[in-house]
Every structure is written in structure tokens, then in C-alpha cells.
Amino acid sequence: MEVPREIIEKLEIFQKLVKKWNKSINLVSDNTIHNFWQRHILDSLQLIQYIDNKEIHLVDIGSGAGLPGIVLSIAGVAQVSLIEADLRKCIFLEKASKISNNNVQIINQRIEKVEIDCSILTCRAFSNLNTIFNCIKNISVREKFLLLKGKNYLTEIVEAKERWLFGYLIHQSITCEEGKILEVSNLTKMI
């Protein structure tokens, strides 16, 4: 993946900030710190190839360490809203957002309570599809969802299809053999 030097430098600053804060609040697993660039930065950054127009509003739910939201903002997404219920993580996200030159909004609320419109919704290491779809009832997603999923992605799709209508594409993760990027569109709840 070709990444401009200026973006790499900002992502390295972000990486240092996460490592520093991870000592006091659990942002990422200690087991992944040694492989942070591959496991977290590239895993998040790979979503940029599925964002055709960076002049959009992207919402990242359960933002925690800013993955993928902060990374995508640094990579050029014009407007990013990060939804995180944990106040300590929101304080971290506020500091991390200063690394990006783009508009980053931190929303310290439970996802179910947030009313917002966006073009794209992302999340990583958050929950299964049914839980994600249920908790975003007040979020209007105009274009698509980009969801970083693990080995249980097919089971999640089958279970979600029992309650929801949606189209989807499955993309292979570039960072993990078991990892997938689930691109979801046209989400509608069944009656």
C-alpha cells in the first residue's frame, strides 16, 4: 500500500500517543503493541481503498483507540465523527485528533443515543453485525458500512440476515488471513 511520507509521519506520532496512553487506559491489547503498525495502523488504513471520495462524513462507532477513525482522518477523510462512551478514551481521542489536519468530532455518548447522518460508518473490534445494526437505529448511513471482521464473519452474516435486509461484499484483509472487510449497503430491518 502506497502511503505518502507526510501521512506516515503523522501515523507514527499517533502510534507513539497510543502506546503512551495504553499504559494507563486499555486502548489496545498489550499482546499487539510489538506489532502495532501491521496489526492496527495498516489494518485501519486498508479501508481507505474502499472510500472513493474523501470529501465525506465518516462515523466510527466504539472508537476506543481511534482505530480506524483517527487513522482514516490522517489519511485524508475530510470529516470524521468518533463515537465513544468511555470518557477516558474520549480524552485520548481529543488529543489524537489534533494529529489530523481534518475535521474530527468526538462524541462521548452511547451509540444508541446518537442521532447523526453520514456517508460511511466504520467499526473495528466492536461487536457482531446484529448488535451493530441494532445500536445504530438513530444513525443514517447514506452510502455504506466498512466493518473490520474476524473469522466468524460468515456466521454473523447468516444471523444478521434473519433480521435485516442488506447487500454486502467481502474483501480479504491485507493484514490478517482470517480478517475480512465487510462492505454493507442498503440496510433495512425486516418487519
Curated annotation (Swiss-Prot):
Pfam families tied to this protein: GidB (PF02527)
Annotated GO CC locations: cytosol
InterPro entries xrefs: rRNA_ssu_MeTfrase_G, SAM-dependent_MTases_sf
Binding site for S-adenosyl-L-methionine: 62, 67, 111-112, 124
GO MF: rRNA (guanine-N7-)-methyltransferase activity
Subcellular localization(s) per the UniProt record: Cytoplasm
Record field: catalytic activity: guanosine(527) in 16S rRNA + S-adenosyl-L-methionine = N(7)-methylguanosine(527) in 16S rRNA + S-adenosyl-L-homocysteine
Alphabetical keyword list: Cytoplasm, Methyltransferase, rRNA processing, S-adenosyl-L-methionine, Transferase
The EC number(s) this enzyme carries: 2.1.1.170
Function, as annotated: Specifically methylates the N7 position of guanine in position 527 of 16S rRNA.
Family of the protein in this entry: Belongs to the methyltransferase superfamily. RNA methyltransferase RsmG family.
Protein name: Ribosomal RNA small subunit methyltransferase G
Organism: Rickettsia rickettsii (strain Sheila Smith)
